[in-house]
């Protein structure tokens, strides 16, 4: 039976609003080339993250947790697609309900037939025909945009992970800032220092940070894409590069490539701040210089000792360099720790706490008697 006139307007308004919600979310997520807030996709991400947290939290082995988390980004993508289609489906069903001869069941059958381009149900009347045509076009456009969206994501992912993989040979797995400086000076056992390559490395990571900041704030689902190896993480790699630059400037200001290191630091902490803000963390753009750091002076001395093992040219007394190092690190520490905890990055040295208590993992080093990696 056709719905009475008094009930048509509320049903049509509710249906139209649901369709607009779906269209807006798809447009904001897949088309607009800047960050546009979509509550629907945010809710999907939070729901998927909660589900994975419940499952992964049952395992103490970090490798097992990483295996479980490896599919989280794919689950978010499928969840977004499902949410868009379901919201649009409900919206078009409500739009068709006032014209459905057999009530709400008929409206949902007609909407589903059109939205999923099955075509087995054709309602009578001009207005219902227009609605089903719109539903068919909406379903097709959503699926097409989602498919076209994937190459963009994986291209950005590959650019990100290429530099991470290259850094692992220099900074260890998981990466650590002092290890990066020590191995670079030691030149992986060649006996010839390669510190002259650090300006180029900092320049590459400055560009990397700009690319990641743009891609990961425009397409936040990229934040959930994990690095291929369980002991590797893009967040930890960036943190290691920033720590190496801060250490270099603080301990060896005459030898350090001052301009490339400073530009890398600036680009790196802007990248981390933007990503942390996308994830709804309240991170100040310019932290107070006297805010301090969670690292202790003893941990700083351990880093200095590691660098001295290979004869790194340390030009200042550690006690004198410590305040300068803290002054650099305070700019990015809070954002880096927040993002690392949110994406469950490997608990590398100097990378902050995790949601589940985990012991810090030092970088892997070759066994005695083997050539250094």
Over which residues does each language-model region extend?
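Membrane-water interface of alpha-helical transmembrane segments
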Residues: 5-15, 70, 125-132
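Transmembrane alpha-helix/interfacial motif
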Residues: 7-39
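Pore domain of cation channels
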Residues: 18-25, 77-162, 243
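Membrane-interface amphipathic/juxtamembrane segments adjacent to transmembrane helices
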Residues: 31-60, 159-175
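Hydrophobic alpha-helical segments of integral membrane proteins
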Residues: 40-55, 108-115, 119, 134, ...
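Cytosolic juxtamembrane amphipathic/interface segments immediately preceding
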Residues: 58-76
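Non-transmembrane accessory domains of multi-pass membrane transporters/channels
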Residues: 162-238, 243
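Soluble C-terminal extramembrane regulatory/interaction domains of multi-pass membrane proteins
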Residues: 171, 223-226, 230-373
């Amino acid at each position: 039976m056709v719905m009475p006139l008094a009930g048509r307007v509320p049903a049509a308004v509710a249906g139209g609003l649901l369709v607009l919600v779906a269209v807006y979310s798809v447009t904001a997520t897949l088309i607009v080339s800047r960050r546009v807030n979509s509550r629907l996709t945010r809710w999907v991400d939070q729901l998927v993250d909660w589900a994975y947290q419940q499952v992964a939290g049952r395992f103490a082995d970090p490798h097992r947790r990483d295996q479980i988390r490896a599919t989280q980004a794919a689950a978010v993508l499928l969840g977004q697609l499902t949410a868009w289609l379901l919201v649009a489906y409900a919206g078009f069903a409500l739009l068709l309900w006032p014209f459905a001869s057999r009530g709400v069941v008929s409206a949902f059958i007609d909407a589903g037939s059109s939205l999923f381009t099955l075509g087995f149900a054709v309602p009578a009347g001009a207005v219902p025909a227009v609605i089903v045509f719109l539903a068919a076009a909406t379903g097709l456009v959503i699926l097409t945009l989602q498919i076209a969206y994937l190459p963009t994501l994986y291209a950005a992912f590959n650019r990100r992970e290429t530099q991470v993989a290259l850094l692992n040979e220099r900074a260890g797995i998981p990466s650590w800032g002092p290890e990066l400086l020590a191995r670079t000076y030691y030149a992986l056992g060649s006996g010839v220092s390669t510190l002259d390559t650090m300006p180029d490395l900092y320049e590459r990571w400055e560009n990397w940070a700009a690319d990641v900041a743009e891609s990961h704030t425009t397409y936040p689902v990229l934040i959930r894409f994990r690095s291929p190896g369980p002991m590797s993480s893009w967040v930890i790699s960036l943190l290691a590069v920033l720590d190496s630059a801060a250490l270099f400037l603080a301990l060896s200001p005459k030898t350090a490539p001052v301009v490339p290191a400073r530009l890398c630091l600036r680009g790196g902490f802007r990248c981390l701040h933007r990503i942390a803000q996308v994830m709804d963390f309240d991170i100040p753009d310019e932290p107070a210089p006297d805010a301090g750091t969670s690292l202790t002076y003893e941990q700083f001395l351990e880093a200095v000792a590691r660098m001295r093992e290979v004869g790194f040219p340390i030009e200042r007394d550690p006690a004198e360099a410590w305040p300068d190092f803290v002054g650099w690190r305070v700019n990015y520490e809070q954002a880096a720790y927040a993002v690392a905890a949110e994406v469950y990055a490997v608990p590398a040295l100097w990378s902050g706490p995790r949601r589940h208590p985990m012991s810090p993992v030092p970088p892997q080093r070759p066994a005695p008697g083997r050539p250094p990696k």
